[in-house]
A protein has these predicted regions:
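A detector of single, family-specific signature residues
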Residues: 1-196
């Protein structure tokens, strides 16, 4: 019994452990300060981009996401069509077919992984924060003709966000959520189900 009283709760090395924890806490605080400085500089640079305010009008697309997309995309003037950027991001559609076999159409995943990441983050954020993107996501996943899985819907929305960003940067137009909702095909009076 006396051995147990002496062995439990040894205090050897507690001072060294305390010093190590203090050092790690200081490192975390220093890194947080550096991150804040970098984000501040990033936000300033983002505001210098022409038409950035128009793009930031999209709910869910913030300065961090926009900076990530534009950094990976590069100069917009080198692209003649938005499909070139879609292909650069690896979101171009490819069909897996051979001979008489026709496989499913999937995104290629060939291209800039980080651009694809930022576009997907923009899609997730827009679906969470913007009503028009929520409606689109719901429409794509619940439509009667060819409903998409949730991930497929997010990829389609990411491509749509890319097209919106491309159009704003090329033409200088403002973001209009009503144009976005034109994809939703609502049943007309002749297509509406008859109530029995």
């Amino acid at each position: 019994m006396s051995y147990a009283e002496k062995s439990v709760g040894l205090t050897d090395g507690t001072d060294a452990g305390r010093e190590a924890m203090k050092w790690y806490a200081e490192q975390i605080l220093r890194l947080d300060e550096q991150l804040a400085e970098i984000e501040s500089a990033l936000h300033e640079k983002c505001r210098e981009i022409p038409y950035a305010e128009n793009i930031l009008a999209i709910n869910g697309v913030g300065e961090n996401i926009l900076a990530g997309i534009l950094a990976e995309m590069g100069d917009i003037s080198r692209f003649d069509d938005v499909k070139e950027i879609q292909k650069l991001s690896g979101m171009g559609l490819v069909a897996c077919s051979s001979g008489k076999h026709k496989g499913q159409t999937k995104i290629s995943h060939r291209g800039r992984k980080r651009l694809r990441y930022w576009l997907f983050q923009a899609a997730k954020s827009a679906v969470s924060h913007a009503d028009e993107f929520k409606q689109l996501h719901e429409y794509y996943t619940t439509r009667s003709n060819n409903p998409l899985k949730k991930m497929q819907s997010l990829v389609v929305i990411a491509c749509k966000i890319l097209r919106v960003i491309y159009t704003i940067l090329k033409t200088g137009t403002t973001y209009d959520p009503q144009k976005l909702l034109r994809d939703i095909k609502r049943p007309t009076a002749s297509q509406a189900p008859m109530a029995a």
